[in-house]
């Protein structure tokens, strides 16, 4: 057995991989073993599995097909490996990634240490503010499903040059998919959803990065989302024509020519962000794209549906989780006005929930009086009927169930949290 594979299978590396998989949680694979059961499974089976891997006898199980609806229609096909295979894949990634980092492009930002969507957006803003305001937005058609496996393994060999490890990686590519209709072979692609897939996608697309660098082009790439910034429309047309041809000819990947297009910053959507020119600062800045904002609002609307069961406290806990996650991702962008609007609408919807849960006029009168409303006004308001939105926008209800009251109940203010996180991005 090779030294590299021994390093992958070492106790320290596999323990770290096990902890990472447990921390990420996630659903089980085709064997129905869950993350919670993983420790017992490893204690019972790991010695045998390790020996099988050493002798090239281990056979990974097929991934479980899960289809996630896309916002614009269609589905994203994910392949969920078994939890044991996730641990092994994570062990491979932990050892091979440091070997890949020195050869990866400076302008590649996906699934790499100390890099993120935010760093990709920051770099794109630098290009825009240097005058590179024509954008070639490349769309690779079903990238993870269409990666040529032989070409990919050739690139892996160039980096690690280790037959035992390459054999194990190829087995994961060939493991197949289990769908409701039965087993399907995988002769193309690397299943999106496995721990290995992000690293393998970067290895494949590093060839594109090198070609773009050799041409002196300014680009940012996050996984298979790649944009190229140039100074003129003529340059953009030339780059789009030659690069799409190169991708199909040299990498054997499919380019979706209906979605690959030339655009300007104002119309660009990249990694969920939109872009605008700040007239005062006279520079390009970013903010959440309108589609991203709409999706966020819809999610909050779902969580504040008055027909959904659960206490106000439970609802607020779920709302806070969504607010923090969304704002942490988009905190680099400018969005004070949007945050203030969402705050106001969110508080109104929570007032409706509270009003409905009080149910009867006597309970509503009691609730308003407890929050400081005078007896007569509380009684008058409480007997207004069940026109929820109309009642909860009345001044006395707004003042009673105020921002401060909802904050004491635990609700995070979108605007306050955004201001806090955005300030950190400017440091």
Name every feature range the model reports, one short phrase each.
Residues 24-31, 100-104, 133-134, 148-150, ...:
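Short acidic (Asp/Glu) and glycine-rich catalytic loops that position anionic groups and cofactors
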Residues 52-67, 71, 103-269:
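Conserved polymerase palm-domain catalytic core
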Residues 77-82, 285-286:
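Conserved phosphate-binding loops in nucleotide/dinucleotide-binding enzymes
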Residues 89-109:
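Electropositive, glycine- and tryptophan-enriched low-complexity nucleic-acid-binding patches
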Residues 174, 250-317, 321-324:
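A conserved non-catalytic segment of reverse transcriptases
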Residues 315-361, 365-369:
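Non-catalytic, peripheral interaction segments enriched in hydrophobic/basic residues
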Residues 349, 354, 358-427:
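Extended C-terminal regions of large enzymes
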